[in-house]
């Protein structure tokens, strides 16, 4: 029965007519992407039963069917599974590009890795074994001993045991393993009946077309293709569950992006790799300098920032973080054109300062001249009842040199003259009565990773790192989404 030749590549689109009894104006057309298995005859059998199920269900919608069968040979397991997964993923991706709503996979071999497909698929995949389990519970509520004729590979993987849970069902197999002809399939069913099976599932795609041609068998033999077709037609599949994905506008600047990602990892309560956040980074250091534009000397970065955010949105990000203080001067214009939120680092920083220091009247700010001139921090702090205190112009010039100069932070320096210049600025702010200072340029925490420092005069001052607060907030939002 088993074909050793690869099925030829085949793709076509067919329109299933509206089911009887439905008014076309009341029907919502849906699109199904059917992926043929390793056996062309089995694929044809399923398509026929899908059409029959659609016509038999008067409550069903009409369907467009996109069918594709790619050339693929059986490989040695598990290498064969891995190769098959890649083929199926490519087909599903092509279905998504064509506007298909959900994927139909009438192939038992693929059920061994269906969880991986569902976890990575952009489309919901109708579960063949879930359809069979629901059918058994509904049509055979008293059945507990389920006979299954399937491949040795699926037996070894425990595919049916996973889907028919122990305690509710007992899975029985024939007392031999190998290829099945129609006659051997009949003998296998007899053997299962003798073992006490109360019903039988042919669990090989190439056997399914012959399930109803076995002749008299003492226990019911399910037709998986018919059951699956009825399930696909009648059941509404929810969109695939996917983990929260954080989108990061990177490259503004590059070192600050790496520092931010490190903080996201550090603040994630993870016990293994899989507990961490999915993160999509669009590293675009070619975005024009934000400060140069704000002080009237450079190109407008709005479009580049927007285009980068749109790429993150297209990549299915749920939330966007921009680890650049000055870039937030452009968020107000960009956000209305996006379908996903940008978390405002300045707003969450101002809120954090107020929560930590309820009676604090003012806060110092170290930032680029562009950030200061835009007033974005001043407005965020005012909403929290905080007054912004900034360096005087000569020291602000030293501040800019420490960031942008030839020995500045953006040039890769994290010690030496740049650190000394910023230390002088901090000393001046402390003399103005400042007790808390916001490191309002994302490169500054690279120089001052501590939460507190002591001035030369012995005064303690708290340093607030906006990227650390942003990372914590991103993680907390991700955790909140995952527990819904």
Segments and roles (model prediction):
Residues 10-484:
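Non-catalytic structural scaffold of enzyme domains
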